[in-house]
Amino acid sequence: MGEQKTTASSVNRAKTYQLVLFPLNNGATNVYYVLVLSYIATFGSKVLALSMLFASVMVTGMRLFDAVTDPIIGALMDRTNGRFGKFRPFMVIGNLIMAASILVLYCLTPIIPASAMGLRYAAFVALYAVWVIGYTFQTSCTRSGQTVLTNDPKQRPLFTIFNTVGSLLGMGAMQFFAPILAKNYEGGYASAGFFRTLAPVGIVISILLTLLAVIGIWEKDQPKYFGIGGEKTEKIKVREYIQIIKNNDPMQRLMVAGAGCKLALSIATNTTVLCMLYGCMMGNYDGLYLPMMVLGYVFSVPFFLLTVRTSQKEGQKASLMKYVSVALVCYVGVLVLLLLWGRGDAFTLSILGENGLSINLYTILFIVFFGIGYGAYYATADMPIPMVADCSDYETYRSGKYIPGIMGTLFSLVDKLVSSLSATVVGIAVSFVGLQSPVSYTHLRAHETSA
């Protein structure tokens, strides 16, 4: 009888609606991931007329600022155990901070006269810094909150699917609406009107997703689910982070894997990269961007099912390694096809021409390699997130301390620092081909017209 009680109480299972709704928190923050990291350099240089070098470096610089805020907020979360739980306050407050800062940044700072350029620089930096704090508040909950949601090894792999669905609702919605909205403004992505419209759209989507995520974790966000000794709060000093990393080998390996996945995603979905690929190279941004984006999502569906099945049978580590390998092989194939590319000949992407369907062998091969590669990669991109909960459980087992905030922000710290390099990598690559600024929608339209 005693054994049965212990066994039953040791497994914390989530209800279906909780597994579905809580991961929408990641979708809510991914709205801002696209809204800020994909466009803020263009906004700073084209709308506010700031130095392009300054605007680009700020993307990396603010990620370094995240290095300071992450451990502080993680420690603060682990000390929080109030009336509204441990995670819900950070989710709501973080989202409101981001909404306010982005609304002011994108809608009000362009009003500052060009003669007060110093004020523009100061406002840009200050509002960007405030946004970073809000972003850290909310993103840390996605990783940390899983520890209270479920510890069932059969359920945790399912988090990847629902997390990706949430990401699609957030990131996918922004990637879908952005080019549509850009067409309505002269200057496209470089116009102030584009940002004034896109910001409120993103904020509304993010708030709705956050509210649903709060509902998902509401029942679980209480002390009885806070691991061993959940009634007490852990007071871990920031300097103890080093010892935690040093003694938690699984967390070390997960940081490397997760950071690599995020860096690859950030580069692959960068607006400049997509504009150069579909617009400058293939000469048909409007006809290729959305179809290829949808194609990648369609190919990812079977891989989601495969990764979950493999995770439940062989473990999440084995699943991650297997399907990332598939993605790597396919992306090598994409690279070879791009090296063979030639404008105006058979080695170029072509889906719809002037006379209707115009698919060639090059396009078929590109679709196969890109589709399978993107599908396999996208299905594994969020797998490190539920694995953070496993590392947190291991830390509780190893040291007896329930510190999900610290574990989540440790992972997030490395994840953000590495992914922030994407803007730098793209910027360096662009400079090598002789461009002085990111490719905008206007630039590629002019390029297509003259081609």
Each language-model region and where it sits:
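Membrane-embedded alpha-helical bundles of multi-pass transporters/translocases
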Residues: 2-445, 450-451
